[in-house]
Design a protein with these regions (language model features):
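Helix-loop boundary and gating motifs at the non-cytosolic
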Residues: 1-48, 226-265, 333
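Helix-to-loop junctions at the C-terminal end of transmembrane segments
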Residues: 50-63, 146-147, 276-290, 376-377
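Structural signature of the two symmetry-related core transmembrane helices
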Residues: 66-80, 293-308
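Cytoplasmic helix-loop-helix junction between adjacent transmembrane helices
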Residues: 96-130
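Symmetry-related core transmembrane helices of the 12-TM Major Facilitator Superfamily/SLC fold
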Residues: 155-172, 384-402
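Juxtamembrane intracellular "pre-TM" segments in multi-pass secondary transporters
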Residues: 174-232
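A late C-terminal transmembrane helix in Major Facilitator Superfamily
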Residues: 348-378
């Protein structure tokens, strides 16, 4: 089972490696300004805010996650059309649809894996790390081979299509989703032995599994105050994360003139993420580090990373900055995933992760990319890095202020 999850994660992240670093590039290849690219990104981010919540609720309720993976892969091909067409309107539409599909997969996959692995953060960390390995391998191959050509949209879209095809195949071999801690094939057996096998955990207490709660489409009572506080603070930090996730590729290719080798720097960041996912997952599972600690360190890491870009605009400095991806993304993601598994009932895992991705990641990144495009056009990248570094610094201070509440 774990091996099939690893395969799924490998090709999922390989698909993202063909889309995420190259999206800004194929839009710039079409002659669009930074401001227009920021607006297109913002439209896509709107889709990635709304649709993950909807589709993840469907996944939670139906457990038809493998079918949903396939549908999301097909919809993500909209990036191909967005890159190749000559209509600005069609570019907006296709970018919207493709963003809705691609950025639904991650939160859906997180909730799905939490159910299949019963919240085991060590195994989850391994599975996610293999996904990161797929991301790294893909970008290293790109950087060394020169494929895809970052100046050719046809080359970029060929890579996107191949990667999504491999992910679709891997999803067909993924394990069946679990229904409240069991596989679908075991559900009937569990129901027959329900009274004997029930354990008094938060996820299957009468209150958590009561029928009235299930009938609601959504209820704020499903999540405690700590969940909402931490989402709010992460929101602030993730506005600045948009620089790394959405606007760094053009900086590396146009300002530092790295050409196709820019993907090697992105791969280096992903490699450091790989290490954090493995080590951090094991430390979390053994209780040697609190999820709050990793989440807090992520804000500090992002602050330092942006300041490095601002004051040391060299390739060597960017190498060090890329390694901080282990903190500003990996530490946050694995820490928050564990935090959610500890504070959210199992039946709401996917929804909780979709709220993290949609409301605390994609929405603030929408704001960040929209404003950032205008900042780059008007003032340049140095001002962007300096101004955005303030946000994770504020988040770090807030994490310290709410330490007792969030660790309690």
């Amino acid at each position: 089972m774990l091996a099939r999850l690893m395969l799924l994660n490998f090709f999922l992240q390989a698909s993202i490696a063909t889309v995420d670093p190259y999206t800004q590039l194929f839009l710039r290849n079409k002659g669009y300004s930074y401001s227009l690219v920021g607006i297109i990104y913002a439209v896509g981010q709107v889709a990635s805010i709304i649709f993950p919540i909807i589709f993840c609720m469907v996944s939670d309720k139906t457990k038809k996650t493998k079918l949903l993976f396939l549908l999301m892969a097909i919809g993500s091909l909209g990036f191909v059309v967005a890159a190749l067409n000559n209509s600005l309107f069609l570019t907006f539409v296709c970018f919207f649809v493709a963003s809705a599909c691609l950025w639904t997969i991650n939160p859906m996959n997180d909730g799905y894996q939490n159910r299949v692995l019963n919240g085991d953060s060590s195994k989850y960390g391994v599975a996610r790390a293999i996904g990161t390995l797929g991301y790294v391998v893909c970008l290293v191959v790109f950087g060394l081979s020169g494929f895809p050509d970052e100046t050719s949209n046809k080359s970029i879209t060929l890579a996107i299509g191949l990667a999504l095809l491999l992910f679709a195949v891997a999803s067909a071999f993924a394990p069946q989703d679990r229904v409240h801690g069991t596989t679908a094939s075991e559900e009937a057996s569990e129901k027959a032995n329900e009274k004997a096998s029930e354990k008094p955990t938060a996820s299957n207490t009468p209150a958590a599994n009561s029928q009235p709660t299930r009938k609601k489409g959504f209820s704020f009572s499903w999540f405690n105050s700590k969940f909402y506080i931490i989402m709010g603070i992460v929101f602030i930090s993730r506005i600045a994360e948009s620089v790394v996730d959405k606007m760094l590729s053009s900086y590396l290719t146009e300002e530092l003139n790295l050409g196709s080798h820019f993907s090697l720097l992105v791969a280096l960041g992903a490699a450091s993420e790989f290490v954090m996912l493995i080590v951090g997952g094991k430390l979390l599972q053994k209780g040697k580090v609190h999820p709050y600690t990793l989440i807090t360190l992520s804000a500090l890491g992002l602050t330092v990373r942006l300041l490095i870009y601002r004051f040391f605009p060299t390739t060597l400095a960017c190498v060090f900055a890329a390694m901080l991806h282990s903190l500003n993304f990996a530490a946050l993601h694995i820490g928050l995933s564990k935090y959610i598994s500890q504070n959210v009932n199992e039946e709401h895992y996917s929804l909780a992760m979709s709220l993290y991705w949609a409301v605390a990641t994609n929405f603030p990144e929408m704001i960040g990319t929209l404003v950032g495009g205008f900042v780059i056009d008007a003032y340049g990248y140095p001002t962007l890095f300096a101004s955005y570094a303030v946000l994770p610094a504020i988040a770090f201070v807030l994490f310290v202020v709410f330490r007792k509440k969030l660790r309690g």
